[in-house]
């Protein structure tokens, strides 16, 4: 009986994910801000059903009911998040809120399957992040000097990245983090926010050629520090964010063309300068030729995705740990192996719907400063997803030093 439940749940999980994904795109039929109470209640229900079936599978297959206890805490968190945020901020974008909760729940489920201890740590980080995120909209509405400290954002960003370059720990050949009190920090993630505030502050009311050049020089300083740190994935994300925010601010296609040409030239230069970039390109071109060394990681990722087929092998029934660093940049391959390619495609579409909603929200914002920030968040968000999933599926070469899609 237990085996029947486990086997049938694979198909129900895929079915509920398809319904949830369809509901995301259904909301695009209506203007931003229009309430779709029935649709969002349906999404909440589907989110709950997907989480229940996933954690039930983990408990039944492993025989360990700690997964159900963990699910109870996740459920409390998701319910509290949706309820509290909706009550405090009545005009919250429910599609983005629901998508965030869905992706968080799935992420915690998969991480708990790979490493329960890491899942607990991630859960604590998510709780702390929720507290801060509840304050951000209030602060943005009450404090009005954010537009006036443009150069402070740039100074802090460059200082943080330089600190990591000088004092950071070397992880797989890249300097990307440092530890403080046993907790590891990756400042480039925080600097992304400062970087977008800097770009918006520099360009929201002045888009002259001189201002664009000055902004490009300072943005280039961020990128160069990341390149010297060998954090090429983050450098690429910062560069793409800069190019598209400048385009959004100026509506000048020449800047976009210049950015694309410059990006191509920088990619060629990186190929010539960094040995590990050449290794990654070789592994991308023919991973099967180097399956025992350079191509091992990507071939294992492709094996995992292929073995999952449409509906997956079932949670705890695959072998995702055969992929080095699977819990980091190859988690999508793990998801496809055990939950199926249909589930994986739905995840991608949910991310795409989030990006499209961010763009729709940006169009509706009248304050140019915040509009550019939202544009930038959307671009950097979708490009980071493109790098991670594209690297793990052999759509693009991996950009990490050793075994990381983008470090």
Language model features: what each stretch is:
Residues 392-403:
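Extracellular/periplasmic helix-loop-helix junctions in multi-pass membrane proteins
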Residues 64-293, 333, 337-339, 343-391:
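Hydrophobic alpha-helical transmembrane segments of multi-pass inner membrane proteins, especially
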Residues 22-40:
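Membrane-interface helix-loop junction between the first two transmembrane segments
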Residues 305-342, 365:
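Long extracytoplasmic/lumenal interhelical loops at the membrane interface
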Residues 1-17:
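Hydrophobic transmembrane alpha-helical segments in integral membrane proteins
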Residues 405-407:
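Conserved small/polar residues in nucleotide/adenosyl-binding loops
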């Amino acid at each position: 009986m237990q085996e029947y439940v486990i086997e049938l749940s694979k198909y129900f999980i895929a079915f509920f994910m398809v319904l949830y994904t369809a509901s995301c795109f259904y909301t695009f039929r209506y203007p931003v801000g229009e309430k779709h109470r029935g649709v969002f209640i349906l999404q909440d229900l589907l989110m709950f059903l997907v989480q229940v079936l996933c954690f039930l599978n983990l408990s039944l297959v492993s025989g360990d009911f700690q997964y159900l206890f963990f699910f109870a805490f996740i459920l409390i968190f998701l319910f509290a998040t949706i309820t509290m945020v909706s009550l405090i901020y009545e005009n919250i974008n429910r599609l983005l809120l629901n998508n965030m909760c869905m992706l968080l729940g799935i992420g915690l489920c998969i991480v708990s399957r790979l490493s329960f201890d890491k899942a607990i740590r991630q859960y604590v980080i998510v709780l702390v992040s929720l507290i801060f995120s509840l304050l951000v909209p209030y602060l943005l509405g009450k404090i009005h000097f954010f537009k006036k400290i443009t150069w402070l954002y740039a100074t802090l960003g460059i200082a943080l990245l330089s600190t990591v370059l000088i004092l950071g720990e070397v992880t797989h050949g890249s300097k990307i983090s440092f530890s403080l009190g046993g907790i590891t920090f990756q400042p480039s993630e925080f600097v992304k926010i400062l970087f977008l505030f800097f770009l918006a502050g520099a360009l929201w009311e002045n888009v002259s050629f001189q201002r664009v050049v000055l902004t490009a020089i300072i943005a280039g300083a961020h990128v160069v520090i990341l390149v010297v740190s060998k954090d090429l994935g983050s450098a690429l994300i910062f560069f793409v964010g800069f190019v598209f925010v400048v385009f959004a601010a100026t509506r000048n296609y020449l800047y976009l063309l210049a950015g694309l040409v410059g990006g191509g030239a920088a990619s060629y230069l990186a190929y010539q300068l960094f040995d590990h970039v050449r290794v990654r390109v070789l592994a991308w071109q023919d991973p099967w030729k180097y399956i025992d060394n350079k191509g091992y990681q990507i071939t294992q990722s492709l094996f995992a995705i292929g073995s999952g087929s449409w509906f997956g092998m079932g949670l705890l029934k695959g072998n995702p740990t055969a992929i080095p660093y699977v819990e980091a940049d190859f988690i999508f391959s793990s998801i496809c192996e055990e939950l199926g390619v249909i589930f994986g495609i739905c995840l991608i579409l949910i991310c795409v719907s989030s990006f499209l909603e961010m763009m729709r929200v940006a169009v509706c914002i009248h304050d140019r400063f915040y509009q550019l920030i939202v544009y930038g968040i959307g671009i950097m968000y979708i490009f980071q997803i493109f790098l991670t999933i594209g690297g793990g599926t052999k759509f693009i070469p991996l950009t990490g030093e050793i075994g990381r899609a983008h470090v």
